[in-house]
Amino acid sequence: MYSCTSPSGIKVSLSTPEIWEEFYPKTEMIVTRNRGRVIFPHLDYIIKGLDPGSLYSIYIHLERVDGIKYKFDAGEWKEFAKGDPILPIQYKEHPRGKRTGAEWMSEPVSFAHIKITNNPEIKDQKVILVQSMHKHIPVVTVKQVRHYKTGYQEDFSGEQFRLEATEFMVVTAYQNEILKNLKVHHNKFASGFRSNGKRRLSSDSENSENSPPKRSKLVTPPTISPQIDLPQQTPYYFNQNFVAPQNYQPQFASAQNYNFEVQNNAQLAWNMYYQKQYEFWWQQQQMMMPGQPQELKNEFQSL
């Protein structure tokens, strides 16, 4: 369950069997459609029985356990329907590439970077496509690399290792409350709830373990030069005192002036179309104001 030995004597076992034992057999893995979700507990293995001087490549892939689609009902997983068509296998080579048996056996072989998604449009080398509400199992493949005169050549099929304790159900939200609490207990960044029932506010390392931190949604206002008094409305509407618009033009940059003193706001240049429209409006108001000669008003109204 926690280790497997091939006929050739290669042994693959879990690096942290005590953690997987707490989750099995009700392990659930949340899947996302954006950047993928890191598998937790992590897939860390200990490999023994390799030829210390020979070269090996190590791969991992996920495969469906059966042809059944499940549903969570009355606190347990039950068969629901015939499974969706099985997807092609996606082999992911360990990023260390080809290494000697001695190197592989010297420390745990970790696939903690592998993520899962149910979005077929994601083409990331670290992401494996899975199917929601289906049971999957990780498979480790060890291939010996042989040296020929023409170069290096991997064994065609290699040896595969499936550890039953790593089986998991793919879900879009945790169904089992006990399992959800285990995730939170072992992974401080896991999606879950606090004891008071409120949603955790910290980021989820399962979602993007090595991704850069998300930017705050709060936008810092730009620094405004003190000698510039910006209007609170758009240039077309801000003048309410029938003052000639030419008096306000120096406040704004021209369309060609990219060194405007208001940082990050070089786009605040008047569009000449609206400038002309505003001038026309101002002239109209001036001619309609009380005290203007009647002949000017008549002349304007006749236009």
From Swiss-Prot:
Protein name per its UniProtKB record: T-box protein 38
Cellular localization per UniProt: Nucleus
UniProt GO cellular component terms: chromatin; nucleus
GO MF annotations, alphabetized: DNA-binding transcription factor activity, RNA polymerase II-specific; RNA polymerase II cis-regulatory region sequence-specific DNA binding
SMART domains: TBOX (SM00425)
Spans annotated as Disordered: 193-225
Assigned keywords, A-Z: DNA-binding, Nucleus, Transcription, Transcription regulation
Gene symbol of the encoding locus: tbx-38
DNA-binding region range list: 14-195
SUPFAM superfamilies in the record: p53-like transcription factors
Species the sequence originates in: Caenorhabditis elegans
Upper classification of the organism: Eukaryota, Metazoa, Ecdysozoa, Nematoda, Chromadorea
